[in-house]
């Protein structure tokens, strides 16, 4: 995830700012080679709607995303791309840079019939200060976040299926906003929520 020394993205999230966005580089691989899928993502909120936009980036351009001195070259590599324009603007306006790594094990389940419905179970959440996804990770000090907990993430269009609604009622489950980014920032001692 990208962040600055003031933890602006963290505080925008925990303070519930209605308009915000943050950036990350994402991969599901542990090592880097020419075929490693790498994604550039923007996650944000615009009033009552949250969104995530993603684009695949080529291995050869990864350094352009990680090195601020090369960010302006992205405008030529991806001409007319709004995600890139916003990213370059925000890297200079907010002075963001790669700041923290978040890792976890994910089990996704997607409904193949009817309306879009997706469950993911994220466990073994780890975080560390760092800026490069593929450095030798043996020197990084990974910290456990919420040890023993699994995060259930529910995504759907319009409504959840009746069978899942019954599970929620049976176990008296409550909706709760969880940010793996914010948990990681807190666990690493980079930022801390303040109470009003």
Predicted regions: what they are:
Residues 1-196:
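Phosphate-end processing signature that detects enzymes handling 5′-triphosphorylated RNA
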């Amino acid at each position: 995830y990208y962040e600055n020394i003031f933890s602006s993205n963290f505080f925008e999230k925990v303070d519930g700012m209605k308009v915000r966005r943050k950036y990350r580089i994402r991969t599901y691989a542990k090592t880097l080679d020419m075929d490693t899928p790498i994604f550039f993502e923007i996650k944000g909120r615009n009033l009552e709607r949250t969104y995530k936009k993603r684009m695949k980036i080529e291995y050869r351009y990864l350094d352009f995303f990680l090195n601020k001195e090369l960010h302006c070259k992205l405008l030529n590599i991806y001409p007319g791309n709004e995600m890139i324009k916003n990213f370059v603007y925000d890297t200079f306006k907010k002075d963001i840079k790669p700041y923290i790594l978040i890792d976890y094990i994910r089990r996704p389940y997607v409904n193949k019939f009817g309306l879009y419905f997706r469950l993911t179970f994220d466990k073994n959440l780890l975080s560390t200060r760092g800026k490069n996804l593929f450095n030798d990770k043996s020197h990084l000090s990974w910290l456990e976040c919420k040890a023993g907990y699994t995060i259930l993430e529910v995504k759907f269009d319009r409504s959840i299926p009746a069978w899942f609604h019954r599970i929620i009622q049976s176990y008296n489950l409550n909706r709760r906003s969880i940010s793996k980014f914010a948990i990681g920032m807190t666990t690493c001692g980079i930022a801390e929520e303040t109470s009003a």
